[in-house]
Amino acid sequence: MTPATAAGLSRLSGVDVAALTDHNTVRNDPAFAEACEAYGISPLCGMELTTAEEIHMVCLFLNYEAAASFEKEVWSRRVHIKNRPEYFGHQLRMNADDEVLGEEDDLLPNATGWGLTEAYELVERHGGVCFPAHVDRDANGIIAVLGTFPADPPFGIAEFRDFGNIPSYTEQYPNLRGLFYTYGSDAHRPEAIPEQAAFTMEVPDDGTPAEAVFEVLRSHMRR
């Protein structure tokens, strides 16, 4: 799925604010942001970080400068294993017209050397927002990996793939109670993007829609 395709399908689904969260990189964010603006979507920059524990964590930033600075530190603790495109596909860097600019040689989704708490603190230092991705999924979900939802780091946000799972999960895992819940499709292919926006949020009228969403999330980042 290319940055421009993701932006275009997001517009068709009625999305007002969107972020591209590739595994452990933000290098397609400029192309995605440009495509979003062409489609009338307000963009955020993002990454789906894989922690040392193999937990996926959504990391969001207001601008590419902050995201790129964050990526630089993340990459200082990357595990360098060559990608095998025949198994994992090509990891392309593209522009907003879907033209290929380059390719990442090392496999991106691997665990980094950043532990969960360290990663949380790193995002904070770079002015971002972070929360555990797809907490109700077995693969790379925080609960599946740790066996519980921890009190530390003090996550105030949790992402679900299915909001119908919230009652059973909050009953079983007390630290999930009272958090701000977001929805994420975890779309890796075009057909996985919902036909209609599946999550809405009340935000103030100040600034751009992306700025408003970001500030709401920032206000909930700490439990």
Language model features with spans:
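Alpha-helix-centered segments that form part of catalytic cores
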Residues: 90-126
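Active-site gating loops and adjacent loop-to-helix segments of metal-dependent hydrolytic enzymes
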Residues: 62-104, 147-148
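Ser/Thr-glycine-rich phosphate-binding loops at phosphate-binding pockets of nucleotides
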Residues: 19-22
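Charged catalytic cores and adjacent phosphate/nucleic-acid-binding surfaces used
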Residues: 1-15, 26-69, 121, 126-129, ...
